[in-house]
């Protein structure tokens, strides 16, 4: 079984980002603070060694961690 590099919550955040949800939208949807959403995004960017949300999305798609 392949283990995801993303936590369940990180995956939920990025699944919303790829459908163009804002940080505020994601926070409301997941019942977490906007700061927590930004932390999840930042953590994923650090794990992947990329700069920016778009770079993280591209890399996660390439790794089949998320899908469109």
Predicted regions and their residues:
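Helix-turn-helix DNA-binding segment
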Residues: 1-34
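Residues within the DNA-recognition helix of helix-turn-helix
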Residues: 9, 40-43
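Hydrophobic residues on short alpha-helical segments
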Residues: 11-15, 45, 57
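Basic, Lys/Arg-enriched C-terminal extension of HTH/homeodomain DNA-binding domains
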Residues: 46-68
């Amino acid at each position: 079984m392949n283990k995801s590099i993303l936590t369940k919550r990180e995956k939920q955040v990025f699944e919303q980002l790829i459908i163009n949800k804002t940080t505020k939208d994601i926070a409301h949807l997941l019942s977490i603070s906007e700061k927590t959403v930004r932390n999840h995004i930042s953590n994923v960017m650090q794990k992947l060694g990329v700069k920016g949300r778009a770079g993280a999305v591209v890399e996660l798609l390439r790794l089949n961690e998320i899908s469109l």
